[in-house]
Structure formats: C-alpha cells, structure tokens
A protein has these predicted regions:
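Switch/connector loops and helix/strand junctions flanking conserved nucleotide-binding motifs
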Residues: 121-122, 217-219, 237-238, 252-254, ...
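Extracellular/periplasmic, surface-exposed regions of secreted and cell-surface proteins
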Residues: 136, 174, 181, 275, ...
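Glycine-rich, aromatic-lined ligand/substrate-binding cores of catalytic
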Residues: 839-872
Length: 1000
C-alpha cells in the first residue's frame, strides 16, 4: 500500500469516526484545529488520541502524525499515547498546533530484553538493570562502555582511557580469581566482540541480567552476568532520515609535576653524595641548567574526535527497516596514537505470510588502532637535562656515566620512528524465522554468525639510540581469524486461562561452534626502512601458529506463570554440553526459580498518593562459567623440541610434556540468592528498586598440588576445581520526577554496596601475583578479598643514629631512611613482616544524575564515583625513589636532609641500600573519588524555524566529559584497573564536545 492510499484511508476512517460523535460537540462557534503530534526527537506519532476535555469529541492522528478536530475557542485538548505523558493544550486563538509528547520513563509496561525473549518490566521476577538510548545519547564518548559507567546498579565499569581499548566491566563484584567478565549478547547472538566495536548511535537499549534467575537461561556462561544489547529497529510510518554529528577536543585531566633540569641536578648531587659516589662536576651549579625539557609536555597533545552517523528507517504494518553508517575518527592525547572505526548496521523484519515473520540483523565494523612505540613510564623517568633533539637534528639520549645520566632512552623519538597498528574487521549477524503455529504457539529458528579478523603489524627500524641502540630492524605480523556459528530453535507458548492464569513457556535448543586460527612471524634485518615487506627480511626470528575449536550444545526452557496480575513465578533450566571438558564432566545443568508478589494489586492494599505500586521479589539459581578454561585443558599437552640421542648426541625432533591431563576439570559454579522489591511512590513520581544478593562461587579453578615425582615442578601446569569466593551486597536505584510542567526536573540515583572474600583456595598457602619491579604487589589468600595488596608497613623515618640502633635490625638503614614495622616481632625486618596493606575492590559505587528541561532547553549534570578501595601508586616507586638516574615528582623537593626535616619523604641515596622503595604501604593511597562525569546543555530548535529546511527536528548539544574530580589520591587519575595498581596507565581524557542531531 503506497503512502497516498494510506493517507486517504486514514482520512476516511477519521471522518467516519467524527460523523458518529454527538452533534452537540459541533456548535456554531466551533472551528477546525489542525495539528501534528511528535515525540521529543521530532518523530511523528501515529495513532495518538486527541480529544476535547470533558466531551466525547475525539480523533486520532494519521500515518503522518497529523490530526484535525472541530472545537470551540475556549476548548482544552487532551493528547495521549501509550508510553508517553498525557498533555493538555488550550486552543485559544490558535488554528494549528504542534504538540510534543515526552516519554513516560516510569511506565510499568516498559519492555525488557531477557534471554530468548522479552518481558514487561512489571512482570520481572529477577534483577535486571536497563538503559534506553535517550539515557546515553548526549554522552560525548567513543563507545557505549564509557557511556554506561555508573548508570546501572551492580555494574563496575573502568575506563581504559586509550582510544579503541575496551572498558572493563564487572557485575556484582569479582566472582572468581580467574576471568569474570560478563557475557555479551547483541541482538540475540552471544559474542566475545568488544562492545567498543558497536556504534553507540545504533543502540536502542541495554539490559544487564544480574541475578541467577535472569542469567540461568545462559547456563554455563551466565555466572558473571549478561549484557543484552539491542540495536535500533524501524518503526511504522514514512521513512526517517537522521544525521548525528559530534566534534570534540580532548586533553589529559591531570599530568604529573616533575622536576625541571636544575631541580634534578640538585637531586642527583644529593644521591651521589649520600651514597659515597662522585657528583657530576658539570652540575656543580644546578641553577645553571634552567628548566630543561618537560618530556610529558612533549608526549602529550590535544586530541580530537569526530563521530558521524547517518541512518534511514521506516516501515509499514507489514515490514520495518533500519539502516545506518557511522564513522569515528580519534587522535589520542598521546603522540602517534590514533583510532578510526567504520560501522554499518542493517535491521529489518517482514511479515511475509500471516503465519511467517522473517527478521535479520547485521552489524559490521572495521577499525584501526595506530601508534608508535610510546612509553608512559620512560616519559616520566626521562631526565630533563637532555633536549629532544641536538643541534644537528638527531634524537638525543644519555651517554657517559650511567650514575649521572641514567639509561632511559629518548621517549619521543620512537613515537615517530616505530610503527604499530592493529586492524580489525567484524561481522555479527543473524537471520530468524518465526512461524505462528497457533494463536498461542510460535516456533522461532535463528542462525547467527560472529566472524572476526584482526591483523597486527609492527616495525622497529635499526637506530643508534643512546645508550642502547637497536642493532637490527624487525617486523612482526600476525593474522587472526575467528568464526563462531549459532543455531537456535525454540517454541514460544503464551496463553491466558480462565482470564486469570497467564502462562508463558519457552523451550528449545542452541548449538554453537567456533574455529580460531592464527599465524604470526617476525623477521629481522631489513636493508631499507621504507621497504620492509616480510620477504625483504634477511633473518627469520620466529614463526608460529595454531588452530583451535570449541563447541557448545544446549537445551533450555523457561516458564513464566502469572495469576491475577499479582503472583508471579519464573523457573528456568539450561543443560549445556561443552567440548572443553572430558567425557565425564562435559554436561552441566543450571536451574533457577524466582517468585514475585505484586502486593499493590491486593484488595486490602491501601490506595493513597504515597505508595502506589509495590512488588516483592525473591530468587535462587545456579549458573556456570567456562571463561577461564582452555579449549583442551582436560588433555595432556606437548611442545616440540630437539633432544640429543645416542653416543654422538645427535639432535632429533622430540615431544616434551608441557601439562598434565586433567580429565576432571569442569565448570566454575555460582549459586546466587536475590531478594528485592520495586516500588512506585508519590503518584508514580518516584521509582525505587532495591536488591540484596548473596553470590557464592564454588568449584573455582585454582592451582593443583602436584607431587615432584611427576616431573612437573611448576604448580601452574594444572588446575583443579576447588576454590570458593563469596560476594554479598545490595543495590539501590531511585528515579524521581521533582518538578512537572513547563519546567521539568528529574533525578536518578544509583548505589551499589559489595563485599568480596575468598573462602577457599584449596590450600592455606597464598598466591602472590601482579609484579612491579620484580616484586609481588598483590596476594590471593583465604578469608581475604581478591587481589589485596601485600607488603611492609612503614613507621615514619629514622631521624638519627639512636633511632636506627634502637629499632629492629634493618639492613642498610641510616638516618633519613624509611622505618619498617617489625610485625613478627623477631627483632629483624624481613619477608615475614609483610602483611595485607590494602584492598583494591571498591565497597561503594555510586552516581547521581539531574536533568532540567524548559522550553526546548535541557541541562544534564551527572556525578559518579567509588569509595572503600585503595590504590597502589606504583608510579611513585620510581618517581619518588631518589635512588637511580630517573626524573622524580616534585614531591621529592620536601625530602629528608637532616633531623626533623621530613617524616614522610626519605633521603636521596643512589642504590637504595635500605630498600626504601620496597613494596609497602608508603605507596598505598585512598582510591575514593567523586567525579563530575559530564555536563551537557541541549537545545531543541523550535519547529517554526525548521519548516523552510524541511526538517522535523534539530537538536544542538554542548557537553563536557570528565569535568572535574574530587579525590585524595595523589596520582594522575584515581580510575585505574580492577587490580588497583596504577603503573604508567594511559591517562583519562577530558572531552569538550559539540553535537548536532537532525531528523528529516
């Protein structure tokens, strides 16, 4: 049916409807009002009800969102549409109206995406957090991971900072000492595709399944939570062309204050004098050196980002379509760092027969990360006494006495000479057929593919760097291919019995298979830097490759039962069979059950303006994780090598046993209990969700003890399912409408509390992990949180010889050195005095958003932060160590130089005889912060200004991301990795953005 015919039919229907209305509504003084109804994005709304208040005089909008109605001059029109706030408009002397309806975000009938289906939010019995496109559309960030930070309770998101890198996401704490990343499902296809490959403008909504009753449908992959991403679909109506354009400039939120040349020379003289070495005679007068080179300023720059998306969507009552293309181009705030991404999205569905609906979703992305060989740590450590280049234009570097000049190469040169890039090409798609077998029964079959290709390429030219030259040029290349195929088949039963018993049932199968193939090689010695194809390399350095496969076969079912809209039951079971495990442990069953009671639907429930709706939920279930299990972990593995045989010792090819067979390895399991409630208060103006959970991980993979008689000395060669971890906590989400009317003010508050503890490692012997300068920083031990910091406890500074003498034996100690506590106490400072010195896991995660709207203007302010965690500032080991030829932070200007001069910063002494810089609480700091994450100001251009341009809507946005941070942390930024160690991290950027959204 073409557009003209649809208009005629809608007009005939409208006229017929009007003809049946009471004649009294059309008095002699009536006039005809023409108008159009749109949403906040300028899209017309089809089927909206437009009526005269207090009468039965009403009409509906046609396929173009237009209406006409005859009313008196003093009439008030009431406009309503499902999912939007009702609106009243006085006619007055107007003859035409443009009405914009705002979405009612508090509607209980909001649809939530769950595994293999959707549910109304009011019918949920589990813990699910959701975000719609409007919640993230004004965020001036490069990927959706950055945009969701702090906005969903129970979700910890840590930004990597570097363009193109993925954020780190944890759901309800760290459930394992191994991989505990959530499963990502995009348009129904489980994938390990990084979410930074998705164009944020294509995302319709994001749902996070948190408790077992929600995640058990994904069985052995649901233990760490599930992130459901749904891309945009076409809507019924004429085609809509949309353009989104964003331009941004970025800079570092904070940079370190380092010594200038004269300050460093004075420090070097102190280090030499205090260690009995000869000071550099050229630095006898440090002030003569001036400021020298600020290497941080040389490495950092202003970054730029541009992000464009063009989309076209529409549909009829039989079919819908959405097509978009996007381009993101970003230059990092560090020299030579660049990132570019192209995306294509195509979604369509068609009711090809009354009994058959076809759907397809295709996501394609291509990206490239590019950089030279930058080194944040060496940039901080490089001495300011050297220029970037010498008088002849050559890169400078230290030469001569290493005690004075050190061994840190010029950190800027390699960013220009070296080349490194990663190219990625991703295809994620599915096609499904939904067959209606009966009004209450459907069969859905989906075929999906997840194809990824990525190529690494790096080239390092031969160069006479000082003090250590690169003797041979080298090139490294790797080609990686991954194909994952999915085939889902399941029945959907949905029926209501006796008007009160509603039953929904999903049952079916899922099969997934993956093939991964990689090849890498490195060749050295290229005659010309400009011609470095692999064939031109003279020396083969290394070559390698491998091919692996895995498969997963599953049976799953979910039952939803509802009685009288009051009592709700959800029961789920999934049985998975994985090729990663031996025959006796290949299959696992993962059940869950949850109940909900909508108390507000009971007849006795008080009807008032305070508590309008109350639903109480409880659930329990078991899910699994195989993320940390290799494809062939249950088998013994061998490496190829050579071995001398016979009397002559002739080398022959041989196989060497690498790991023991482990046929008993199986899934890690998580049993989770969840109790919560959802409430609506104050005439639906406040929405409160609360959840309390206990999350117990069992059968966690830990190192197995192996008898030395086996021939294996390294206990990491095999693992056993014997570990236990517990996470407990609660989550609160509160959304309020504070002011309604011409001025609107809404607030959102999200809070998460989580405690983490290792219950068992199958041994009382701790594991020490994460090294800095060849010393372990973190520890795994029974009855402690995951990754606690482990080291010495400081006790001020020795001020004189008497204090040194009266203290426990501390080798190398002299006045001005750090004093360490003797915790044993055995009178000697040694490894036995190390203890837990901090917990990197945040106990509190919180955020608050405020949005004010008035006459087309919208101001949004978003705060986000964490508390209860510590950070190990590993940068300070070298940058306040004052024991080697490294530049230092200006903190060392307050160093100890005599009794009473300092109680926190030790003396400068080359070689560090007291080990002042050993792992200790000296480097542990409070990691709490409150960040003004974003401010955005948007303006919706009035419709009368747009008519001449044939625009439906236009929106201009000015925004800033990472505006300011309140923190006691002295490092560059308190947002560090989940292990809590801050070491040469890529800095977080502050972004200033201007955006334009046009809808035609």
């Amino acid at each position: 049916m073409n557009k003209t015919n649809r208009k005629w039919i809608s007009q005939i229907v409208a006229c017929s409807f009007l003809a049946m209305l009471p004649i009294g509504a059309y008095a002699q003084n009536n006039k005809t009002i023409h108008g159009v109804v749109k949403d906040a994005n300028g899209e017309t709304i089809i089927g909206a009800s437009v009526g005269q208040k207090g009468t039965k005089n009403a009409t509906v909008t046609n396929l173009d969102g237009e209406f006409s109605i005859s009313v008196p001059d003093n009439a008030v029109l009431e406009i309503s549409y499902i999912g939007y706030n009702n609106q009243r408009v006085a006619v007055g002397g107007k003859s035409s109206l443009e009405i914009v309806l705002t979405e009612d975000v508090h509607k209980l009938n909001e649809i939530v995406v769950v595994g293999y289906g959707v549910m109304k939010k009011k019918d949920l019995t589990g813990a699910v957090g959701s975000l719609a496109a409007k919640d993230i559309e004004n965020s001036p960030v490069a990927n959706i991971g950055q945009a969701i930070q702090g906005k969903i309770a129970g979700l910890q998101v840590v930004d990597a900072g570097k363009p193109g890198d993925n954020v780190t996401i944890k759901v309800r704490g760290m459930g394992s000492i191994n991989n505990c990343d959530p499963l990502v499902v995009i348009d129904g296809v489980p994938t390990d595709l990084g979410i930074n490959a998705i164009n944020m403008a294509d995302v319709e909504r994001l749902d996070v399944l948190k408790d077992a009753s929600a995640t058990a449908i994904y069985g052995s992959r649901g233990a760490n939570g599930v992130i459901m991403i749904t891309t945009k679909k076409g809507k019924e109506g004429k085609g809509r062309l949309s353009l989104s354009a964003n331009l941004a400039v970025q800079n570092a939120t904070r940079t370190p204050d380092l010594l200038n040349a004269s300050q460093y020379a004075a420090l070097s003289n102190d280090m030499m004098n205090n260690s009995g070495n000869t000071a550099n005679p050229e630095w006898a007068d440090p002030s003569a050196l001036g400021k020298g080179t600020n290497w941080v300023d040389e490495l950092f720059r202003a970054g730029y980002m541009q992000n464009y998306t063009l989309s076209y969507s529409g549909g009829s009552d039989k079919a819908h379509y959405y097509v978009s293309g996007g381009m993101l181009d970003q230059t990092g705030i560090v020299r030579s760092v660049k990132y570019r991404r192209f995306t294509f999205q195509q979604n369509s569905d068609a009711q090809v027969q009354p009994w058959l609906k076809m759907t397809s979703n295709i996501t394609i992305s291509a990206d490239r990360k590019q950089q030279g060989s930058y080194d944040m740590g060496n940039t901080y450590r490089a001495l300011p006494v050297f220029a970037v280049k010498d008088a002849s234009g050559e890169w400078t570097g230290p030469e001569g006495n290493s005690l004075w000049y050190g061994s840190v190469r010029n950190p800027i040169g390699p960013t220009t000479t070296d080349r490194s890039s990663t190219k990625g090409y991703n295809l994620l798609g599915n096609i499904s057929a939904e067959v209606t077998l009966a009004k209450w029964l459907k069969l859905k079959s989906t075929f999906g593919i997840d194809a990824k290709f990525w190529y690494n390429d790096s080239y390092t030219p031969k160069h006479n760097w000082k003090p250590s030259p690169v003797e041979e040029s080298s090139r490294y290349k790797s080609d990686n291919k991954s194909f994952t195929y999915l085939w889902d088949n399941y029945f959907i039963f949905d029926h209501t019995f006796a008007k009160k018993h509603h039953v929904g049932l999903m049952a079916g199968t899922s099969a997934q298979w993956n093939n991964f193939d990689y090849l890498n090689a490195q060749k050295n010695v290229f005659a010309y830097d400009g011609v470095h194809e692999m064939d031109n390399g003279e020396k083969m350095h290394a070559i390698g490759g491998n091919e692996t496969e895995w498969a997963l076969m599953s049976y799953m079912a979910r039952l939803n039962y509802e009685y009288a809209d009051r009592y709700l039951l959800t029961a789920t079971v999934r049985r998975d069979g994985s090729s990663r495990f031996g025959r006796n442990n290949r299959w696992g069953t993962f059940p869950s059950v949850s109940l909900a009671w909508r108390a507000s639907e009971e007849e006795w429930f008080p009807k008032n303006n305070i508590l309008n709706d109350l639903k109480i939920r409880a659930g329990y279930g078991v899910t699994g994780s195989q993320a940390s299990v290799g494809n062939y972990s249950y088998l013994a593995s061998y490496n190829t090598s050579v071995y001398p045989f016979g009397k002559t010792g002739t080398e022959q090819s041989a196989l060497i046993s690498a790991t023991l067979a482990n046929p008993n390895i199986h899934w890690e399991q998580v049993a989770q209990t969840n109790i919560g409630f959802d409430a609506a208060l104050f005439n639906q103006r406040a929405r409160l969700t609360f959840d309390y959970y206990i999350k117990n991980t069992t059968d966690m993979l830990v190192k197995a003890s192996i008898p030395i008689t086996s021939g294996f000395e390294d206990t990491s060669t095999t693992y056993t399912n014997a570990g236990k971890v517990r996470n407990t906590g609660f989550e609160v989400s509160l959304n309020t409408v504070n002011i309604q009317g011409p001025l609107q003010w809404e607030t959102g508050i999200v809070y998460t509390y989580n405690r983490n503890k290792i219950k068992s490692l199958n041994s009382d012997v701790p594991y020490y992990i994460n090294q800095v300068n060849n010393s372990y920083v973190t520890m795994l031990a029974n009855n402690l949180p995951i990754n606690v910091f482990y080291g010495y406890v400081t006790d001020g500074i020795f001020q004189n010889e008497l204090e040194v003498k009266e203290h426990a034996i501390q080798t190398g100690a002299e006045p001005g050195d750090i004093r360490f506590k003797d915790l044993t106490p055995d009178g000697v400072i040694n490894d036995n005095d190390r203890t837990v010195i901090g917990n990197p896991n945040p106990t509190h995660i919180f955020s608050m958003s405020n949005t004010l709207a008035w006459k087309g203007l919208e101001l949004s302010v978003y705060l986000q932060g964490v508390a209860g965690n510590k950070i190990f500032n590993a940068n300070k080991i070298d940058l306040t160590g004052m024991s080697a030829a490294y530049n230092q932070l200006t903190d060392v200007l307050s160093r100890w130089h005599g009794e009473g001069t300092s109680t926190t910063m030790p003396r400068a002494v080359y070689g560090d005889p007291n080990q002042n810089n050993r792992i200790s609480d000296r480097f542990v700091e409070n990691g709490a912060y409150l960040r003004l994450k974003s401010i955005s100001l948007s303006y919706n251009v009035p419709q009368q200004w747009l008519r001449a341009l044939t625009l439906n809507s236009a929106r201009i946005t000015f925004s800033c991301e990472n505006v300011a941070t309140i923190t006691g942390y002295s490092g560059f930024d308190p947002e560090v990795g989940v292990n809590g160690i801050d070491l040469s991290s890529y800095p977080i950027s502050r972004t200033f953005n201007i955006g334009l959204n046009l809808n035609f």
